[in-house]
Amino acid sequence: MAKISKRLQNLKATVDRNKLYAVDEAIALVKAAATAKFDESIDIAVNLGVDPRKSDQVVRGSVVLPRGTGKSVRVAVFAQGANAEAAKAAGAEVVGFDDLAEQVKAGNLDFDVVIASPDAMRVVGQLGQILGPRGLMPNPKVGTVTPNVAEAVKNAKAGQVQYRTDKAGIIHATIGRASFEAEALRENFSALVDALVKAKPAASKGVYLKKIAVSSTMGIGARVDTATVNA
């Protein structure tokens, strides 16, 4: 443990906790400090000017990151007929209807994303207690309940991330891996922030992008100067 502590101490010394860094500088610092023995994820935390206790100020949605997430995902689709065939053609690993529901009830959850056609929700709705706590419940707000299941599968495979404000009004999301080029991380950063800005609730008043920080799994975090977000 002491070795890890010393490593973190040295890493933290490279960042001024009181300084706001330009986006590119923050990404470069965090990327350079991601020195663990695995490909660390690069994450973003955005504190939004919303009151998450009010339903009309909950920010939720999804965005396809232009450079992907660096993670391969297994997709399950609840659909039948032509939709089921389209989902398979788009690359879904698991496709089914009542049979897939039985698999889920039996505890077979070998997938990362669940997509459903609207007519399948009568089946999927019964699985809420299983899928919900795992963050797998399909929802139209994030594009996982849709008549175009093939497009949803392609988006999931292409690097779509879902976001939702937590109880403190903060969005947490991954924008890539430490192995990504800085330019790719910046593109993903911009895509996510742009999506959040477009999703701003009408009821949100005052400063919307209050604080932004970039960090890695085992490394440091750097605060971002929001004035440089669109620079």
UniProtKB/Swiss-Prot annotation:
GO terms for biological process: regulation of translation; translation. It comes from the Bacteria. One of its GO terms (molecular function) is tRNA binding. GO terms for cellular component: cytosolic large ribosomal subunit. The keyword Cell inner membrane does not apply. Keywords: Repressor, Ribonucleoprotein, Ribosomal protein, RNA-binding, rRNA-binding, Translation regulation, tRNA-binding. HAMAP family: Ribosomal_uL1_B. Part of the 50S ribosomal subunit. Belongs to the universal ribosomal protein uL1 family. Binds directly to 23S rRNA. The L1 stalk is quite mobile in the ribosome, and is involved in E site tRNA release. This is Large ribosomal subunit protein uL1. It comes from Chromobacterium violaceum (strain ATCC 12472 / DSM 30191 / JCM 1249 / CCUG 213 / NBRC 12614 / NCIMB 9131 / NCTC 9757 / MK). The lineage of its organism: Bacteria, Pseudomonadati, Pseudomonadota, Betaproteobacteria, Neisseriales.
